[in-house]
Amino acid sequence: MTLPVQDALIKVGGSRWEAALHRNGQVEHLRLLSDDGWVDVDFRKGAYAGFAWHGEWNGEKHVIGVTLDERDTDGAIFTGSSGALNFSLRYHSVDGQFAVTAAVANTGKIPVQPLSLGLMTGIDTYMEKFPDWNDKFFPTLLRCERTHFWGYCMRPEGALIGIASPQPIASWSLQYNVGYMEGELEWGGHRVETFTLDFLHAGPLPERHPQRLSELLPGETKEWTILLLPFKRPDQLLTSLAPVCAAPMLELERTTLAKGECTCMTIHSCESVAARVLLPDGRRMTVQPEAAGEGKYELLIQAGESQGHIRIEVENGSGKQSEAIVSVRPHWLWFLDKARTAALICPPRATSHCESWYGLYTLYSSQQYFPDREMLEQTEQIMSSIYPLMFDMETHEPLLVKHRIQNVSSMVGVLVDRYEATGDEAALQRASDLADWLISHAQYPDGSYRAGKTHYTSVIYPAKSLMELILAEKALAECNAVWRERLIRHTASVRRAMDELVAADGDIDTEGELTYEDGMISCSSLQLGLFALMQPEDERGPYREAALKLLNGHECLANLLIPDGRQRGATRRFWESQYDVAIQPNMLNSPHAWTSWRTYGTWYAYLLTGQVYYLEQTMNALASCVQMVDMSSGALRWAFVPDPYVRARQINEQMVVSDWSRAQEGHHHTLKYPSQEFVIGEQYIGMISDWHEANLQDNDVHEHFKCLAEVSLGKAYVAQDETGRLRTWNCSAEEKNGILHVSPTEPKVELVHLNLGVKKVCVHFESGEISADLRETVWVRKDGRIIRDLFIGQ
């Protein structure tokens, strides 16, 4: 069908791009040529279409219309105006790549100081259903530097689009959807409509952002060029964007260091560079990175005695600046100790949401590392007071919101930790009974665990909780027929659930609004990974491959390139603040507690494959997450918010519970209560359950410390990566006379994982030396035992 003249699409393009444009300047479709062929980029229609000028000033939001002004075979220019502001939008090629150049001029007599003014990109980031979401580009990273901008969008199937501007951009924002309405009140949804690049924006903005892009003076014109470049792999991004931005791009393998450790930062730059370093103790220094090849420099970053953050600002000869943050941490046990203290300050409570009593994980697991009779008694008193309010003591049935089967499975996990902390077999018996209730009431014939008809196998990992129970039951089952029968029953249930996950191949549901959901994907991967590790080598294949496929797709939701030790490895979650800490509207919570679900997944992936890439991700993410404990004050925070500017409201008057004999239910919409408005931007958010009594879920932060206990406490790692380099975590390694000497650098290390191939090794535990003649990847215990598979014990 031929379109009417007024709606006919404008076809433009260059050697590496093709676009179809509407006459209002918005993109109907865009194709970019990558090394692997053409990549289709979908664009939104309606209110979120783009590219389009959007702004907010004088208390009103504005969408500025533009119309076609001129065109040629390579591009088109659109122009429009609003009051004294004249706007233009040009599509064209820069070095063969797709580019959008936007300009605005103030023809008036007074300054224009908008709250925001920029381009809504219109790129379709709306991940609604399977399998469509596999072809949507999620805005994985958007980063303003003082002199330029860069970032990328990524699909679950692996394609990337780099986004770069050689000009400074004040800010950015994601357009979050509305999930559902409660009368006239909006609850934030689980999808991102698209995103906006705010060329001008009012403060306050994060210190790294340009600070003087808040106004347009009379007679002034400003112009920005945005380039979109397709990539096959993330490791191509920084090298390629450096010349586009004409700025240094900073690459860090390790974003957190223990005291005394060092890391090498690679700087991609077409010009020579200098670096200014601000140390945690306040000292400043200027250093000269060393040339390491064409367009590449290296800077060695050494952690001193002071814990906190090292800020590195790199500047090239043209004055372009980029910033990195490397965290310097105390030992891992310090974080667990502080989290335990916080779990009694913000105590677990009986509610309809297991997130409210997640602190029990930390309280019980820390008892194994810091035995303390008084704190254990307090923990047991909490458990004794809240458990009967949530579960029937005889039937083990949940007493409220029975469809939230994650409440049941999470309590199974807590009771396993209680058993391991106290040796009380009654705790494991109760966990076993709860598991039986879950299996009989929530497992469907296809093997999945469900809440009603909704697939719940991957909502707070119920199968992993059962696997934790199974691992605890194994020792008892060796000499007890009753426990053996329970072990067999629970193992069979988990196998059915994992077989169903393999068969589903990503076509699964989640709690709340369906999307390519951070936790749904990471929990699927981690459960499949752990189950694979519990199988003999020749039976792992289907579970391992399914776990890795999901985990690799999940990279589009993970912060794997950001040079920031506060955020590295964090997953891009954005609807939890409204439930956990009574803050609205939506904003990224990254890291949030559920980031640690990916950390389990990458750890299991490393143990399954030996690929150091996964171990590096694991340790970087773990270190970012445990920094929810403030390394200066020791206080526990809830999450980190990377959004640069969010006008938010939070409940500011204490919500009091009148009847402590009942478990609390439901959520609390911010606007139903007295609240206060303030601006949030690239910062930590504190916990609030120390002064609010109502059902809030900020205790979910304790997932980080549950993960810490499983992945890193009492463990050290030595591995040889694909380049032949020796990599260590929680230990040092030095070769002398043909023997690799490994010395733990963390307290209470009892296991060392050696991924070295054929090698003679001597491990220097606190209790003595253990020598081993390695032929394969193994764990070495401090008692001298060599273990090939940690979750099988062989």
Predicted regions and their residues:
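Beta-strand-rich N-terminal accessory domains
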Residues: 1-101, 105-180, 185, 225, ...
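Catalytic cores of extracellular degradative/oxidative enzymes
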Residues: 329-596, 603, 607, 612-625, ...
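Short, hydrophobic/aromatic beta-strand segments
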Residues: 108-118, 237-238, 274-277, 751-754
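Extended acidic/polar, glycine-enriched regions
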Residues: 274-334
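Low-complexity, Pro/Ser/Thr- and charge-rich linker/hinge segments at domain boundaries
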Residues: 127-131, 238-260, 322-352
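Terminal, non-catalytic domain-edge segments
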Residues: 234-263, 271-272, 307, 472-485, ...
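Short Pro-Gly-centered flexible turn/kink motifs
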Residues: 214-232, 788-790
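Trp/Gly-enriched beta-strand surface patches
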Residues: 134-215, 272-274, 281-287, 760-763, ...
